[in-house]
């Protein structure tokens, strides 16, 4: 896997993402950060698990305790999660529907397909762990996509909905390229890290370790990016969000056939 790390600081207008619009003003480059060498959890081998790896053990991260696990063994959406509906901000023409999210065969499924209820438009799914906000922690999501088209998004969003900050720890632009981005400040400063050469159609364990002084991005147990810039690290409660998005109106990230984002499990840790 080829690893390409690019840090860029971009000054945007205040409006962005869920109900806001980005307006680029300037760009500068930040110095690379030394990555932790300590391995992070990938999962526990299990022949019965849909992805062949079950959630990590309670002691998988020294100094942390396992505080939340969802393995989607039951048929319903876990308690504490809310489903998105409507047009996502910053993505005109796209559409999210609660009917495009469900739990099947031990997996959380976000499904993008042409929906007759929306005039046969491409409609995707998304949800947030809005009922379980936390301050700092380590979040791990084992997921894959079934094909190209809509992107895969895993992020932390402010619990009070006062944006920024925002931590996107897996926001793909293709099935082989993803980015991690932190937004902060009233001008929406951005630090972005790119990862190329990864196969998003295979099962991967994505993670973010968020502490008072650092944000570390993790893929399959290995740190691949880190942020230590003063002011960039959020200090407010945030919630985990999972989404698929299309940009068919501008001829990007638009599927040619139905595509799914599959999630085998979610595990969250917090310091003891």
Describe the role of every protein-language-model region.
Residues 12-38:
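C-terminal region of N-terminal signal peptides and the immediate post-cleavage residues
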Residues 2-5, 9, 22, 35, ...:
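GH16 jelly-roll
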């Amino acid at each position: 896997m080829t690893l390409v790390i690019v840090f860029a600081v971009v000054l945007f207008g205040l409006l962005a993402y869920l109900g806001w619009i980005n307006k680029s003003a300037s760009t500068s480059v930040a110095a690379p950060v030394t990555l932790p060498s300590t391995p992070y959890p990938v999962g526990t081998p299990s022949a019965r698990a849909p992805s062949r790896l079950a959630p990590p053990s309670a002691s998988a991260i020294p100094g942390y305790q396992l505080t939340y696990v969802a393995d989607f063994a039951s048929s319903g959406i876990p308690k504490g999660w809310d489903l998105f509906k409507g047009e996502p901000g910053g993505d005109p023409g796209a559409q999210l529907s609660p009917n495009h999210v469900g739990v099947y065969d031990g997996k959380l499924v976000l499904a993008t397909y042409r929906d007759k209820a929306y005039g046969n438009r491409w409609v995707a799914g998304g949800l947030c762990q809005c009922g379980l906000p936390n301050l700092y922690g380590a979040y791990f999501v084992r997921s894959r996509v079934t094909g190209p088209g809509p992107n895969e998004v895993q992020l932390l969003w402010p619990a009070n909905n006062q944006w920024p900050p925002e931590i996107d720890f897996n926001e793909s632009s293709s099935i082989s390229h993803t980015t991690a981005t932190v937004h902060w400040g009233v001008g929406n400063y951005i630090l972005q890290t790119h990862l190329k050469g990864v196969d998003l159609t295979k099962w991967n364990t994505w993670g973010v370790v968020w502490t008072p002084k650092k944000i570390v991005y993790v893929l399959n147990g290995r740190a691949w990016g880190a942020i230590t810039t003063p002011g960039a690290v959020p200090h407010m409660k945030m919630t985990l969000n999972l989404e698929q998005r299309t940009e068919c109106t501008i001829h990007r990230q638009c599927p040619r056939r139905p595509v799914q984002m599959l999630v085998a499990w979610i595990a969250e840790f917090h310091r003891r």
